[in-house]
Regions:
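Extracytoplasmic
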Residues: 1-130, 167-186
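Solvent-exposed, flexible loop/coil segments flanking beta-strands in beta-rich domains
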Residues: 124-177
Length: 186
């Protein structure tokens, strides 16, 4: 059993260059592969809900976002790129970046890439906010199955374009959400 555990952990051993950057700094793992902690004896400082796929409510997302926006946040984040479904797929075929949008905004706002290899991206906390304050560039009521012209966002490197939607559900969709799960939106 000990040998089997050691063999499984060896797959998540980090290369020398990554370990030189990490040293004994605090680190969190995103989105969920905590095996890196045990395999490399890292100084783990996890967010409150430490596996992104279980951050399924706005409340839990806000807990993680507040953590990354605080002095309690780790010095580094190891963002694993190779997991089931590819780089941007979460469980159940969900889009990873939709799992916790508030948390993701805080990661992008406070962390910048310092090292990358085919398996992961290592990000270091910046001393200042990296993104400009959000502004509304377009709002309105739009129809399904119709193209929407997206504003050009190439004027600055510290801007990202985000969309906030409010989808009105039919009575049957509300019932399905209550009894089973949300309907798919693409």
């Amino acid at each position: 059993m000990k040998k089997r555990s050691k063999d499984l952990l060896s797959v998540k051993k980090l290369d020398h260059e990554a370990m030189e950057i990490i040293q004994d700094n605090t680190i969190d793992i995103y989105p969920w592969e905590t095996t890196y902690i045990a395999a490399n004896n890292l100084n783990w400082k996890p967010r409150p809900v430490f596996q992104s796929y279980i951050t399924y409510t706005p409340y839990l997302d806000m807990k993680n976002a507040n953590f990354y926006n605080s002095v309690k946040s780790p010095s580094l984040i190891l963002w694993e790129k190779k997991h089931w479904g590819g780089e941007v797929e979460s469980i159940d075929g969900r889009y990873l970046l939709n799992d916790e949008p508030l948390t993701l905004f805080q990661i992008l706002n406070h962390y910048r890439p310092v090292y990358e290899n085919p398996s992961f991206l290592l990000m270091r906390r910046a001393d200042y906010e990296l993104l400009s304050q959000p502004t509304i560039v377009l709002q309105g009521v739009y129809q399904w199955n119709a193209w929407l012209n997206v504003p050009n966002n190439r004027t600055s490197t510290n801007h990202i374009l985000r969309a906030k939607t409010n989808i009105k559900r039919t009575s049957s969709q509300k019932l399905k959400k209550l009894l089973y799960k949300e309907f798919e939106v693409y």
